[in-house]
């Protein structure tokens, strides 16, 4: 996974920024769910395919893609959401996936979910 454009938190709720990360991809490549949840939206927004998944207190968005899921579908981490489409503005190559993460109305960096993973050692059982 290569990041084409990083998250840039807006200084104000409607100010400029980049409310997600852009990940380089291949045309028609599979787009998979990052975590389990329920699809709350799958369809076009401003001419591009979008899928939104609710995960309890947060929701993730994926665009542009040709959705393979419909609203109400329950997905697990790794399930197919659709196929990557061209047409994301600002992408330096043919196709990029814009991946967003929201908690309420606050945009978060979706990559922080991976950066915060702390290794844990488990006790060795002798028996």
Per-region residue spans from a language model:
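Zn2+-dependent peptidoglycan hydrolase active-site motif and core
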Residues: 34-68, 98
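Short glycine/threonine/proline-enriched tight-turn/helix- or strand-capping micro-motif at secondary-structure
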Residues: 2-33
């Amino acid at each position: 996974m290569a990041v084409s454009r990083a998250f840039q938190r807006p200084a104000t709720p409607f100010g400029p920024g980049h409310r997600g990360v852009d990940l380089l991809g291949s045309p028609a490549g599979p787009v998979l769910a990052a975590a389990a949840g329920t699809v709350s939206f799958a369809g076009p927004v401003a001419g591009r395919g979008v899928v939104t998944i609710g995960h309890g207190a947060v929701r993730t968005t994926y665009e542009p893609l040709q959705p393979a899921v419909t609203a109400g579908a329950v997905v697990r981490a790794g399930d197919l959401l659709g196929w990557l489409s061209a047409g994301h503005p600002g992408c330096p190559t043919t196709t990029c996936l814009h991946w967003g993460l929201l908690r309420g109305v606050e945009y978060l960096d979706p990559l922080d979910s991976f950066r915060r993973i702390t290794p844990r050692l488990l006790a060795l059982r002798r028996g």
